[in-house]
């Protein structure tokens, strides 16, 4: 059946017969829902586009941070190498100083042994000159 300008004209529907006016109201209601859905989808599409831009920006920032981190790691490693070198030089210097002190102590010990020997010799002479009573 077709619409012939009569608002009371009936059309066959699965749920029964409806008037053209009811059909148009239903159609208008559906059109409004579709418009609302389209508006919502458009807004969500815009939000998705904004989120994609944010993700791209964050990806760029991550790459920049990774490059900065790599540069800092290289600088840190260079500083650690320099620090290790300075520590090794300091330890070597301390070792040399301790070796020098050891040599000096050995020399002093030799001198003291020599002096002790001389004192023993002097005591022996004195004992010969003036024997103990």
Curated annotation (Swiss-Prot):
Gene3D superfamilies, A to Z: 6.10.250.40
Domain of life: Bacteria
Disulfide bond positions: none
Similarity section: Belongs to the UPF0134 family.
Protein name, entry field: UPF0134 protein MPN_151
Organism name: Mycoplasma pneumoniae (strain ATCC 29342 / M129 / Subtype 1) (Mycoplasmoides pneumoniae)
